[in-house]
């Protein structure tokens, strides 16, 4: 009864007004699964290929008509009739059909849309929520939200070179309370920025992009907001950074153009270690550039015992790159973005490999999102304990938080909030 009888791809708009792929998968019993594919602004060089048309007469070249055509034609022809519950078999067939190492022929956006829609259709057919269908009976851990409330780097037009400044309400007793804490801090920060004469418009991920001079200035503003909202930094709420260092790593050095500073590899590590010592920072994402394996090893040896070091551009949700990181003792956590690798099975494989090696996993959105809340279910399904899905503004971000609220309510007494145990520095 879970045989695939129809696959319908379409071009929709993401949160930045750019086209993306949405896919409906219809099963023999009438069950329907729908998935929309996200898109990143700062993308790693080793990510799977997001296929764009390149036709300047449509959407300034960013159309996804070729990917949609692949969904409606070649992909449906290949997997029509397959049983949707056989996810691994379907994903393997999609990879074989594409035939490239980076999904460059059909496009990761086409393959992922189908892969996720298949899982959602199968869950619907079984009468199960997606997190339970994918994760099984023990999927009940609600993740700590990593809320990006100040933006810099590629996500903002300000002098701050780091891309994201996040708060983590790890001391909260539940996900719902953690979300409330975050919202209260967000609004307190907004008032503080406004009172100081800063712009409070929000960026791609719902965070503020004030014209602050440095990372330290941003961290100080966030600390004050936490305290003014009535919470204790380093006890109730912790800080996190996404440096997105690949974006400013040029000619072997880290060139902070906004701040007017250049740091070599050793100086970059020393600077991050200094920030960890000075502030209650418990997680740093992409503290070193994606191919600076030497720098990553030095950073891990220096602060890895007291801070979560998350590889995003470094690992790109790819088991081959993660395997190298584990072998070399580089980083201690992986950021999981479904569209970096391009299928559900490969995403789950990356999380499983990380957990087996004692690495943490963080489920993540992209800066170009939709109302699709699949990653909320996947965060619970994988018991990863952390989710990164933006600030407390913009419905493309809050859609994921709201889905997690529903899941926590549905789980009732069996729900567990990951809290401090989710973070290597606090466990």
From Swiss-Prot:
<keyword id="KW-0963">Cytoplasm</keyword>
<feature type="active site" description="Proton donor">
    <location>
        <position position="205"/>
    </location>
</feature>
<feature type="binding site">
    <location>
        <position position="242"/>
    </location>
    <ligand>
        <name>Mg(2+)</name>
    </ligand>
</feature>
<feature type="binding site">
    <location>
        <position position="312"/>
    </location>
    <ligand>
        <name>Mg(2+)</name>
    </ligand>
</feature>
<feature type="binding site">
    <location>
        <position position="337"/>
    </location>
    <ligand>
        <name>(2R)-2-phosphoglycerate</name>
    </ligand>
</feature>
<dbReference type="GO" id="GO:0004634">
    <property type="term" value="F:phosphopyruvate hydratase activity"/>
</dbReference>
<feature type="active site" description="Proton acceptor">
    <location>
        <position position="337"/>
    </location>
</feature>
<dbReference type="InterPro" id="IPR020811">
    <property type="entry name" value="Enolase_N"/>
</dbReference>
<dbReference type="InterPro" id="IPR020810">
    <property type="entry name" value="Enolase_C"/>
</dbReference>
<dbReference type="GO" id="GO:0006096">
    <property type="term" value="P:glycolytic process"/>
</dbReference>
<dbReference type="InterPro" id="IPR036849">
    <property type="entry name" value="Enolase-like_C_sf"/>
</dbReference>
<comment type="similarity">
    <text>Belongs to the enolase family.</text>
</comment>
<keyword id="KW-0460">Magnesium</keyword>
<dbReference type="GO" id="GO:0000287">
    <property type="term" value="F:magnesium ion binding"/>
</dbReference>
<feature type="binding site">
    <location>
        <position position="163"/>
    </location>
    <ligand>
        <name>(2R)-2-phosphoglycerate</name>
    </ligand>
</feature>
<protein>
    <recommendedName>
        <fullName>Enolase</fullName>
        <ecNumber>4.2.1.11</ecNumber>
    </recommendedName>
</protein>
<feature type="binding site">
    <location>
        <position position="388"/>
    </location>
    <ligand>
        <name>(2R)-2-phosphoglycerate</name>
    </ligand>
</feature>
<feature type="binding site">
    <location>
        <position position="285"/>
    </location>
    <ligand>
        <name>Mg(2+)</name>
    </ligand>
</feature>
<feature type="binding site">
    <location>
        <position position="367"/>
    </location>
    <ligand>
        <name>(2R)-2-phosphoglycerate</name>
    </ligand>
</feature>
<keyword id="KW-0964">Secreted</keyword>
<comment type="function">
    <text>Catalyzes the reversible conversion of 2-phosphoglycerate (2-PG) into phosphoenolpyruvate (PEP). It is essential for the degradation of carbohydrates via glycolysis.</text>
</comment>
<dbReference type="InterPro" id="IPR000941">
    <property type="entry name" value="Enolase"/>
</dbReference>
<dbReference type="InterPro" id="IPR029017">
    <property type="entry name" value="Enolase-like_N"/>
</dbReference>
<keyword id="KW-0456">Lyase</keyword>
<dbReference type="Pfam" id="PF03952">
    <property type="entry name" value="Enolase_N"/>
</dbReference>
<dbReference type="GO" id="GO:0000015">
    <property type="term" value="C:phosphopyruvate hydratase complex"/>
</dbReference>
<dbReference type="InterPro" id="IPR020809">
    <property type="entry name" value="Enolase_CS"/>
</dbReference>
<dbReference type="Pfam" id="PF00113">
    <property type="entry name" value="Enolase_C"/>
</dbReference>
<feature type="binding site">
    <location>
        <position position="366"/>
    </location>
    <ligand>
        <name>(2R)-2-phosphoglycerate</name>
    </ligand>
</feature>
<dbReference type="GO" id="GO:0009986">
    <property type="term" value="C:cell surface"/>
</dbReference>
<keyword id="KW-0324">Glycolysis</keyword>
<comment type="pathway">
    <text>Carbohydrate degradation; glycolysis; pyruvate from D-glyceraldehyde 3-phosphate: step 4/5.</text>
</comment>
<dbReference type="GO" id="GO:0005576">
    <property type="term" value="C:extracellular region"/>
</dbReference>
<keyword id="KW-0479">Metal-binding</keyword>
